[in-house]
Every structure is written in structure tokens, then in C-alpha cells.
Amino acid sequence: MPPLGPVKRNDLIYYLRRLDFEGPYSGGSHQFMMKGNTTIRIPNPHRGDIGKDFLIRILRQAGVNKKDWEKL
């Protein structure tokens, strides 16, 4: 169960796939993942983890609440 905090990019992709998102697909300057009509951009790989505030914004765009995220 992932805590709502910093997460590695690959872990974010793994958990989004567990939430039935497909991808990541190449597109423009960022990859993206899709679930139905919902499309979210995935941050480019960098040295550090994705911070808590940025993770919250990504999850909000994906329509994932804190409880669903922490149940994974």
C-alpha cells in the first residue's frame, strides 16, 4: 500500500496500471496514460522522486482519491 508521499516515476506508472490506466504512450514532450476519456501526463524521468504535492495534482487529474491510492 503506497503512502501519499514521494514516489518514483516507475512506481507511479505501476500503480496507475493497477487502477486500470493504459500506457504510458509517447506524445509530445511527455508520455501519457489513459483510462476511458481521462488522459494524464506522466512526468519525464529525473533523478529525484515525484513530490507529494505533484503526486496529489496527478491523482486529482486522474480522479483517484487518497483512500483508493492507499488501498493499492
Can you describe what each PLM-predicted range is?
Residues 1-27, 32-72:
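Basic nucleic-acid-binding interfaces
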